[in-house]
Amino acid sequence: MPDTTVSVEATIEPAIEPTIEFFAGLPETLSNVSLRKNKQTGDRTVLFTFQNLKAIEKFQSFTNEFHGSIRLKDSEGEISAKPSSLKFIFGGDEGDDLKGVKCGFEIHEDEHWERFMRFMNRYAEANGMVYQDKA
């Protein structure tokens, strides 16, 4: 099956801090990531969790260009993934306070998975995150 959800652009750039963006020039802060593999198909699913989205705060999304995908940028270049799921989590007394956002996408090809993992290692190191295997 061709991989239509993830594209990888390789351009070596000087040390660039890894970022995750929905909108051009508006880096988001990742709260958690969950990685899963379908044992039958071998497809891998990534689920990003964000406690806040800068794109939503103060309606900044109206002033920045939407990519139509989530972009992961680092010194190796850019990964573009089309979300397969996007869930907004609300809470608070009135139920209208944004408590988080979950964004999922699939990776079908091994070389794209390896590239994604290199990005995640860089992102984790730059942001004080640690990988924990729950298998």
Show which residues each predicted segment covers.
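Long, contiguous binding/interaction regions
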Residues: 2-102, 107-135
